[in-house]
Amino acid sequence: MQKAVYLVLLVFTSMCWAQDSSFLAVVRVDYSSTSGKEDTQFSLDKERHIFFIESDNKEELLFYNAFLKENEESHSAGTIKSVKRIKNTKAQQVYSFEWNFENSYDAIKSKAFVTLEINESETTNKESKAIITITNEKDLQLVYKGIILYYVNPLLFYYRLEKII
């Protein structure tokens, strides 16, 4: 599993360099639900990950919801807009933002509203966790929970989010 994570980071890093972008955070999804119905096994089978990526010119933040399993590659990707800070404590940060996205699998373009909750590890040997809730204009609600596999730097991550508030 760890080898797969490194491979994913290598592939996406290469893609980001080609597009003049850099990673801010990567979340491995360990739990998922669609409109209240748990579908965790689907996300695990497809190796769902969430990526926060910054463009090299520092003008845009991108949000990717991607399947990484070989021969199953598909994603929804787009820009983050209108970030609002809801909570900011040492143990927890909560943000909401608009996400203008396009799906690779059906070319649909739309807007969704995202809440990002980050629960920081209380000790240095535990991983921080994220809860991501995505709601679209048709009231579809997606909930993803998982471990933050990669942070470029937690302070930089928060700074970049807050810069576009």
What are these regions (language model features)?
Residues F42-T79:
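N-terminal, post-signal-peptide region of Sec/Tat-exported proteins
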